[in-house]
Amino acid sequence: MNQGEIVYQDDDDYYDESEIYDNYEEGAEFIEVNGQLVPHNPNLQAQQNRPGTSSMIQQHNRSMEVNQGLVKDEPIDTSSHRVYVPPPRPVQRKLFQPGPSTPGSSQYTVRNLSNLSGSPSMYDRQPASLPRTVQPMGLEMGNSEQRKVYIDMKDHVSHIRLKTKKKVFAPGQRKPCNCTKSQCLKLYCDCFANGEFCRDCNCKDCHNNIEYDSQRSKAIRQSLERNPNAFKPKIGIARGGITDIERLHQKGCHCKKSGCLKNYCECYEAKVPCTDRCKCKGCQNTETYRMTRYKNSGGAVSNTNALMSLTNASSTATPDSGPGSVVTDEHGDDYEDMLLSHKPKVEMDPRRFPWYYMTDEVVEAATMCMVAQAEEALNYEKVQTEDEKLINMEKLVLREFGRCLEQMITNTTELTQDLDAAPTDDIPGPSTSTS
């Protein structure tokens, strides 16, 4: 029998060999099937119509002949055989595609992938469109027009951010104005109120420049007619005596909720205390409040030690040393975080404050001493080069500054101790001068 004609039976086909042997042993009648004698079995005749049954019978008869020695057994050929494969089943594959309406919505499309046996890759895959990239601001980069709109909008947003970005100004640098309707000819324009021309400002339709000199002069005359002190500085200097010099606000502030501890309070920004001219509410920008808070924080105990440390540092400083320390109120920036309850103002002797002794005469005398040391260093004959003269001059000036500061601290401490020991019946009113 040709091995190439062997057909494997399906899973549902079966062949019961026990019935054949039982009939053969009992001497049942044989019938001729395809030129061969096989036991007669009605059940086997019903199975002959099924695919693969006749081949199975032929194979069984051949095995019987081999056992009886009628047919010689030959080696099995290892050539290929025909195999019945079950028909391919349709495979469903889910592909994700974004919805056309909203960028965040999604749809699922089911595609039947058939004809698996004919495709080399076993799958008839249709080209699926990739999800489109969703651009910011809801713009899709589908074509050139949308890309152009997106670029224009991005540039516009960048320009707005750059324009509204907070700028940092150097100390002493004037802030630009932002006038839009006053033409910078009103007193609420900082440039016009300070008697300066607008420069590098953000104002619109500006007339505060040399091109509109006639209109600017007319606006100045009108302002002076209404208020002769219109262009005077807001922070003025009043002299009540020979040594009583105070800096105060000309009109006073009108703060209500900040406690006069914010930079939009003109008194606080100018480093001057509020006075009776101010109409503020809940004011805490006073010397009494400053000293009370400083004592509660424990700074009054180490006040003298800190000043003496500054004196020693300035006396031993050299040009190679870094920038020296500056004595400041370490808790000055924490006023906003450590607000005390509002208390009635208590009158104190101004002679207890350190700024009381920093008069113009003391500053002038200390300056003259340092200038004399500088001249002496420049006229020093042993020093040959200019660099050595400058280095020596800096050393002598710093040493003289430390000596003057130490002398002022010593005298101030002695006078303060005398005030604590001696009772004072007449205490002058609180002074508003600062250093």
UniProtKB/Swiss-Prot annotation:
Residues that coordinate or bind Zn(2+) 4: C253, C255, C260, C265
Main location: nucleus
Annotated region (Linker), positions in chain: 235-250
Region DNA-binding, annotated ranges: 175-188, 253-266
Residue sites binding Zn(2+) 6 per the record: C260, C274, C280, C283
UniProt key word Transcription regulation: yes
Effect of a null allele: Decreased protein levels of DRM complex components including lin-9 and lin-52. Double knockout with the programmed cell death regulator mcd-1 results in 100% lethality during the L1 stage of larval development. RNAi-mediated knockdown in a ced-1 mutant background results in reduced somatic cell apoptosis.
Record: residues binding Zn(2+) 2: C177, C191, C198, C201
UniProt entry keywords in alphabetical sequence: Cell cycle, Chromosome, DNA-binding, Metal-binding, Nucleus, Repressor, Transcription, Transcription regulation, Zinc
Sequence positions that bind Zn(2+) 1: C177, C179, C184, C189
Stretches the record annotates as Disordered: 73-136, 415-435
Biased composition (Polar residues): 102-120
Site entry: Critical for interaction with target DNA: Y188, Y264
Pfam families, A to Z: TCR (PF03638)
SMART domains found in the cross-reference section: CXC (SM01114)
Location of this chain's protein in the cell: Nucleus; Chromosome
Family in the record: Belongs to the lin-54 family.
Protein name (record): Protein lin-54
Originating species: Caenorhabditis elegans
